[in-house]
């Protein structure tokens, strides 16, 4: 009678490692969660700072600048972050393709296969390091325009390499035949370590960015603030705004009586100089404290200096309605009608502007 032999520990380990999915899958789904859930609120606010209109001629001033066409493409792609879930899938997909093509073009395979993820991680670390600066008084089209440009260049290089080489391009989620299981494990470890490093950098160096963005979208302001460090000016300010919005008995503190920021915020203006963190939340604060004339002047100055954005246009609608400037409010609503995804806001405020 034949006895079934138990496989050796070495064989069991080999089968487990061989069956382990491709590292690219881990990268794609891991950073879909990173951009769609963990960093989704920040990228949603970036989308709200980014003006992209379908109206004829609206994007012409940007088109006529250096790299204007690329920044328009970047702004168009950034609109996907109106839903962070789908925006995260888009950005993670772009970075996955960049990693895949980098491995092919630069022959990063076998034990050096993990190096193909370096360009994507450079982008991720730059985004986390800059925090508010990825959208505050800067060209928001760069955020997705730059990875789009890199992806396009790599795709052209891959076509060129394939045309003059016998080396075939492996399937996107199929590990190349020449990769050992150990190589995939090494790549996964590399992804997990650098991914954890990106989260760690954000939590230690920019701990105020995510809670500020979440409160700026008015979702669970008080609950978010209670879990965050109120010694950062932007977090404390939006907590105060939430109280003024929800509780009528809370005093409306004038701007000049706001306490100074107790801990520094990494924030720069359009000229690259350090910006007072107060300027980041000042318009929202004036709206909440019913200082509408000051908010109006701030909004008009912002429109003239930085141009329109969905966030600023919606602020101006609220301000103009409070100051009974209904014709101007209708003008801003008409611009919002040319933007994608702003239908709910328009339906909420358009009736009041028509009265």
Map each language-model feature to its residues:
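Membrane-interfacial, low-structure loops and terminal tails that flank and connect transmembrane helices
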Residues: 2-18, 164-182
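N-terminal membrane topogenic signal
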Residues: 12-28, 110-112
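Aromatic-anchored segments of alpha-helical transmembrane domains
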Residues: 32-36, 119-131, 170, 177, ...
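Membrane-interface coil-to-helix junctions
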Residues: 33-77, 81-86
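Membrane-interface micro-motifs in multi-pass membrane enzymes
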Residues: 45, 49, 63-67, 115-164
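Transmembrane-helix motifs of polytopic, lipid-linked glycan transferases
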Residues: 92-110, 125-126, 154-159
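Soluble catalytic regions of membrane-associated enzymes that act on cell-envelope
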Residues: 201-355
